Amino acid sequence: MVSLLIVVGSHNLRHFDLTLLPYALASIFSAAAVAYRYAVWLQRPPTKRYWQQGWRLFWQGGLVRNSVYLGRLLFDHFATQRFIGRRSHLRWVMHLCLSWGGMLAFAVTLPLVFGWIHFATRVDNLQVYQVFVLGVKVQEFALGTLSAFLVFNALNFSAVLVLVGIALSLHRRLTEPGALALQQFGNDVLPLLMLFAVAASGLGLTVSARWLHGHGFAFIALTHAATVTALLLYLPFGKFFHIFQRPAQLGVAFYKQAAQAGPQAQCGRCHESFASQMQVADLKQVLVELAFDYRLDGPVDHYQDICPPCRRKLLALNQARTLHGVGSWGTDPRPPTPDPCLPDPRPLSS
């Protein structure tokens, strides 16, 4: 699919730059691997259930209302990422720099690599650049203007944002005890090193071209190509895959909203509300698909019909009866009262 889009978008490769071929090949492989892993991820019973229910709830309610709510979720989860700000202001700024720097870099790089965007100078004035998108001229600007500065330095801006995010992330990982205890090199440190290599080598191209008179440009260009290719190949298999999983989390927000507004499930033991009926029913179905049987013989048909506090109480009571035989904790001389929700455990043999 990506290959077809490259051919069509570049007008049968007419505007495709062969010097960017390694980037294009790595992008094609990365897209195929991401699509395969995403399809496998969606086949997991819990993920599949959330996915199906999320789309059903989106189309089931008012389309306009749900579209507005989806737009608000996109703004909160992707543009501002306020859910991270509630945890830590440092992590919020760090994620904003990394996410916006990465999105800006991909928004500029991929259309250029695929040949969807190309530049040309006017025939009558070589100081004026024309911007073509899918072969259609959309803008032109003269060299030395603000538009030229912003266009030609977009990747530099993204690299600076990424470097700031990396610095904040390293500061957190070197100073917070929790991060130090849980971090792993392959999952937490390696992605930062790869991002640093891409951003630093990209800025190195600008430094070489503008201030070093092209000295070392070929070596830096090869290094940058190698680091970008490695990053693209790493996308489907490492921590960066959560970037593609994140949009699916928006369906969970629809699910939670419907669960709060819908009928609630009542505990079979204390008869208190503890979750939505939809969530309990979905959980039962997922457990069946995972080959877990939590059905009970008694007044309560299924273990998931019991609220978490009662589950803890039942566990303690039945363990006490099993270990001590009499009383709740072996101190009460009265015979134990069987709980109607769970079968009595077999007494230990003497």
Task: Give residue spans per PLM region.
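Short recognition patches in nucleic-acid-associated and regulatory proteins
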Residues: 273-301
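Short metal-coordination and nucleic-acid-contact micro-motifs, chiefly zinc-binding Cys/His arrays
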Residues: 262-266, 300-303
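Short polybasic linear motifs
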Residues: 329, 334-336, 341, 346-348
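Short cysteine-rich clusters marking metal-coordination/redox-active sites
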Residues: 267-271, 307-310
